[in-house]
Amino acid sequence: MTVILPDFLKSNVLVVGDIMLDRYWYGSTNKISFESPVPVVEINNVIDIPGGAANVAMNIASLGGRVRLIGLVGVDDAAQRLKKRLTECKIKWNFISVDTHPTIMKLRVMSRNQQMIRLDFEKKFNNVNTDQLMNVIKVYLPQYKVLALSDYAKGTLDCVEEIIKIARFFKIPIIIDPKGVQFSKYKGATILTPNMSEFEAIVGFCSNEEIIIKRAKELMNEYDLLALLITRSDQGMTLLQRSLDPLYFSAQSKEVYDVTGAGDTVVGVLSAALSLGENLEKSCFLANAAAGSVVEKSGTSTVNVAEINNVVQKYEYTKIPTGIVDRGLLKYVVSVVRGRGEKIVMTNGVFDILHYGHISYLMDAKKLGHRLIVAVNSDKSTRRLKGKHRPINVLERRMFVLSALSMVDWVVSFDEDNPIQLILEISPDFLVKGGDYNVNNIVGGKEVLRQGGQVCVLKFQEDCSSSSIIDTMEINEIN
């Protein structure tokens, strides 16, 4: 299956946050200063690149999306250079000029592909009156599908609680790249995207995955967050949601050249995809692919659709196990394919004597999504359900036959009377049964609907069932 990228030209995001100018001085280094034992860099090129929240906007614009940037700047040359560059990239901007502060600028001196030194020119915008900023946000926010907040702790988002309140009023998803240890100010946001260091600064050191998951869910519950996307350097990313198992996205870069601005790229692509109605899993998958591309570039950079597509299609062909699996492996492989944006279909039954009705039903079920899980009653479960003379075929044979079908991705068994616990663990996008079931009476149906999935009843061949086949065989034996 090939991953289809969304039409990023239709993405629609408002970006608010700390705006910076990233200035790069490039030069050659061939001698040591006589004044002090430091290298002398002969500058031969100067490049100015929008950074911080402006880099988030640049990444969205690089995809062809519609984006507006709002933030605080000084009254200076750096602000003018930002305005010129953003306008060239077709980014709409609303800058609130503060004459008591300079535009934040980070100057990096580069030589021989190495950063020699970084010099920061800044005065945090703390205690600056944000009334004008809030008024501009109130005007433009209803025109956009997603709000991306880029917090570098420079003061622009000191009013973040009020911004979140307004966005929630308009039911607009809020994606925040956070900073600092006061995550309480982000209460009510949709998604936070901390890196691992930022996450552990809040919850404490996490020695294993179990602790990460536990503390992440505690954090989400405490601050009313829908999800956390933790960026983990060479370990990729982990998406954690309150009621679902974590999703892991492996790092996609072949070689990490420069991580500058990678977090901006993640927020930009994630926000753009969500603004197009993509689900959270696929949006994170695309953001992870974008991050894998941007860290292979030097300096503050952006990605385009072709670069994301190149990473995505290579990632798509990563092999994952199929066939007969246990519950632990099933949860893992479902996590992997969900990270690719694939939809999960799940059905269950005894499947004692496989027949035409089963095959046609499973073919129709597979058409609903990308992956089909068949949960099979164990022998003990079947006897409790069908009687002491069933099953005709033992579990191993039933699962083997099902796993050989091209439309079936995974076969898993359950020993309980019904698969409710398994359904809750997997949380399929589609729960399917065949026959004359009422949706309200399907085991796990209400739970799947509550988690945003769908419950489907497919037409079953009336003259085909294992029981009727067995009955016919018994009649023929009598005759």
UniProtKB/Swiss-Prot annotation:
Key words, A-Z: ATP-binding, Carbohydrate metabolism, Kinase, Multifunctional enzyme, Nucleotide-binding, Nucleotidyltransferase, Transferase
Membership in a protein family: In the N-terminal section; belongs to the carbohydrate kinase PfkB family.
Binding residues annotated for ATP, in chain numbering: N195, M196, S197, E198
Any single GO CC term annotated in Swiss-Prot or TrEMBL for this entry: cytosol
Function: Catalyzes the ADP transfer from ATP to D-glycero-beta-D-manno-heptose 1-phosphate, yielding ADP-D-glycero-beta-D-manno-heptose.
Associated pathway: Nucleotide-sugar biosynthesis; ADP-L-glycero-beta-D-manno-heptose biosynthesis; ADP-L-glycero-beta-D-manno-heptose from D-glycero-beta-D-manno-heptose 7-phosphate: step 1/4; Nucleotide-sugar biosynthesis; ADP-L-glycero-beta-D-manno-heptose biosynthesis; ADP-L-glycero-beta-D-manno-heptose from D-glycero-beta-D-manno-heptose 7-phosphate: step 3/4
EC number: 2.7.1.167, 2.7.7.70
Gene: hldE
Stored NCBIfam families: cyt_tran_rel, PRK11316.1, rfaE_dom_I, rfaE_dom_II
Assembly description: Homodimer.
GO function term, MF aspect, one: heptose 7-phosphate kinase activity
Catalytic activity: D-glycero-beta-D-manno-heptose 7-phosphate + ATP = D-glycero-beta-D-manno-heptose 1,7-bisphosphate + ADP + H(+); D-glycero-beta-D-manno-heptose 1-phosphate + ATP + H(+) = ADP-D-glycero-beta-D-manno-heptose + diphosphate
Pfam assignment, any one: CTP_transf_like
Xref: InterPro entries: Bifunc_HldE, Carboh/pur_kinase_PfkB_CS, Cyt_trans-like, PfkB_dom, RfaE_dom_I, RfaE_dom_II, Ribokinase-like, Rossmann-like_a/b/a_fold
Start and end residues of each stretch annotated as Cytidylyltransferase: 346-479
Residues of the active site: D264
Species in which this protein is naturally found: Blochmanniella floridana
Region of interest: Ribokinase: 1-319
Entry protein name: Bifunctional protein HldE
Domain of life the protein comes from: Bacteria
Swiss-Prot/TrEMBL GO biological process terms: ADP-L-glycero-beta-D-manno-heptose biosynthetic process
